[in-house]
């Protein structure tokens, strides 16, 4: 699956529902979202059961991290619907750098939550570093790395600052 395909899927969702907020998108798509306070190290999960998509999010996470997890799980629903119909995806075992589904869901979350225009404006000049870029946009470094990689691979001229790590949510 190409980065451009992921980006185009997000564009279609945003145009159709008029929002980039993952919780609003999940609601508009009739996905049941539940917060669980006993998930321990699991950040979230998505599953398909009885012809209905469900997303579970760790209720102990800070609100901004819950938004990232919601966007990530939405990515699984949009990009990996068939895989979800076969088996639920839990985000303790799936934050694996070698997993293409996790990489794609992280890319989806980054492109959904961070607009190209905002990143370009915040980047400003060649002296911008990852820390100041994240601070100005209120973004986690791992998420920002995925966004920068997406923009770079789509030819938007943003330099890559570090290698993307699909496990960035697992460490928090």
Can you describe what each PLM-predicted range is?
Residues 1-172:
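Active-site hotspot residues in diverse enzymes, especially metal/ion-binding acidic/histidine motifs
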């Amino acid at each position: 699956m190409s980065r451009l395909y992921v980006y185009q899927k997000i564009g279609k969702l945003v145009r159709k529902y008029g929002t980039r907020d993952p919780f609003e998108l999940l609601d508009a798509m009739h996905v049941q979202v539940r917060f669980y306070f006993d998930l321990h190290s699991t950040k979230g999960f998505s599953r398909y059961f009885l012809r209905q998509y469900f997303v579970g999010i760790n209720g102990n996470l800070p609100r901004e991290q819950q938004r990232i997890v919601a966007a990530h799980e939405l990515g699984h629903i949009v990009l990996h619907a068939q895989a979800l119909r076969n088996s639920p995806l839990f985000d303790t075992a799936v934050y694996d750098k070698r997993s293409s589904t996790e990489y794609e869901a992280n890319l989806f979350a980054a492109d959904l939550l961070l607009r190209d225009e905002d990143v370009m404006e915040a980047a400003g000049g060649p002296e911008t570093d990852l820390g100041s870029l994240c601070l100005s946009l209120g973004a986690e470094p791992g998420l920002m790395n995925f966004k920068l990689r997406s923009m770079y691979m789509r030819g938007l001229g943003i330099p890559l600052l570090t290698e993307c790590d699909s496990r960035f949510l697992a460490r928090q």
